[in-house]
């Protein structure tokens, strides 16, 4: 049972999490993976404003887009500060786009973990050395949790491609640039 109404209705992330736990516990043979695969693939959508073939929980999308005065006000202030270039804040729309990318990564990696694939290929990610480096350099590595999540998404998306050698080497080379040799963590700044 969920603590909130929203949590009760959001299913994609929890379904991936449950299936990963079943995999870790080596209990896959006790479940109908064909139905589970179909269920996860049913979330693959083409919704305006998001990359084609993303995995999108429509309930999450509904609650994220629901108008709230405080969220709207914060976004407007963030946009003004961003324009002034004093500091850079993520708006609700950017957070939502990153969430959808993370859910897509999670669904694809879950399907591959159980030996299955998405119905349609997800292709909206950097694919060559220049695009990959440009994308990774655009991330805020002073906030490694978020940047690392985006890096992980790129690793998953790159791993499902047939021609992945350049991608993988570019990802490895970039990680070597941002690793801190004193603590072994991946970030920039202090």
Label the predicted regions.
Residues 2-8, 92-96, 189-190:
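Short, recurring structural edge motifs at helix starts
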Residues 20-23, 112:
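Alpha-helical repeat scaffolds in large eukaryotic proteins
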Residues 21, 27-30:
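Compositionally biased, flexible interaction segments
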Residues 29-184:
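Extended ligand-binding groove/face enriched in aromatic
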């Amino acid at each position: 049972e969920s603590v909130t109404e929203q949590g009760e209705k959001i299913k994609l992330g929890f379904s991936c999490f449950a299936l990963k736990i079943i995999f870790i516990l080596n209990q896959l043979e006790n479940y109908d993976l064909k139905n589970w695969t179909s269920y996860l693939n049913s979330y693959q959508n083409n919704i305006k404003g998001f990359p084609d073939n993303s995995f999108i929980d429509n309930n999450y999308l509904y609650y994220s887009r629901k108008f709230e005065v405080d969220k709207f006000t914060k976004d407007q202030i963030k946009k003004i500060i961003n324009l002034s270039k004093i500091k850079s804040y993520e708006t609700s729309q950017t957070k939502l786009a990153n969430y959808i990318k993370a859910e897509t990564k999670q669904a694809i990696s879950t399907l591959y973990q159980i030996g299955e694939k998405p119905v349609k290929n997800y292709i909206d990610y950097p694919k060559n050395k220049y695009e990959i480096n440009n994308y990774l350099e655009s991330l805020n590595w002073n906030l490694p949790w978020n940047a690392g999540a985006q890096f992980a998404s790129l690793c998953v998306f790159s791993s499902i491609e047939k021609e992945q050698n350049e991608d993988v080497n570019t990802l490895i080379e970039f990680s070597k640039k941002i690793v801190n040799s004193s603590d072994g963590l991946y970030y920039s700044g202090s």
